[in-house]
Amino acid sequence: ALPVVDKDGKYLSLLHYSGFAKGVLTILNPEKRHAISTNIDLIQKTLNAQPIIVSNDSDKNFNATILVGSSSDETFIKRLESHASEDIVVIASDREQIHKICIEHKVKLMITTSGCVISKELRELAEQNGVSVIVSPYPTSPTSMLIAYSMPVSVMGDKEIQTVSMNDTVNKIQKILKDAYCKYLPVVDEENRVIGIVSEH
């Protein structure tokens, strides 16, 4: 388990394996629609992607609706239109028509896969429409899986975990640990700065 802190070292949440695994598995569940909180910079770093066009707000978090451009053009357009009010991230392979559709519909981010670079004409259109474009070195399937790991730890951290004070007794902490589903508790000082972690083991 790892405590998540702000820039002053003050406690925000606890990142633990069960919570992390649950979060990632929920996102990867194909039966459900999910938006993930991330930003373009984090996606680019996670994928080790090449930036082609990146917006000025690339470090700003947003709730990304992830779509894969693998269906027919008509079906894909319908899917885009059904998510029109959302911040859409599209994972596309080397299909130029899908690239054009994404740019014309002004998606937030288009990720081409397997090192595919878009044409000069589409690059100019993407700049005009404010569409960010990055190139993933991976095929479509691994790219789709890896995006889930671009979420910042501030999103994955468990905010329900109770903190304990550096002056709390072992007796008090034992009772808290016994009832807690996560067997780690962050230890904080008077200013809520993390000074350690206590565990049941």
Could you say what each language-model-derived stretch is?
Residues F20-L28, H105, C116-K120:
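Internal alpha/beta core interface subdomains
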Residues R123, N129-G157:
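Long, charge-dense
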Residues C182-K183:
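Short loop/turn microsegments at loop-to-beta-strand junctions
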Residues L2-P3, V89-A92, K108-C116, E124, ...:
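Short hydrophobic alpha-helical runs that function as membrane-insertion/retention elements
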Residues A1-D6, Y11, D41-I52, N63-I77, ...:
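Bateman/CBS regulatory modules and CBS-like beta-alpha motifs in cytosolic regions of diverse proteins
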Residues L67-S71, Q97-E104, K108, T112-C116, ...:
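Non-catalytic interaction/Regulatory regions outside core domains
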Residues S18-S58, F62-T65, G130, V135-P137:
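Juxtadomain coupling helices with adjacent low-complexity linkers
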Residues P3, K10-I27, Y138, P186, ...:
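Short beta->alpha transition motifs characteristic of CBS
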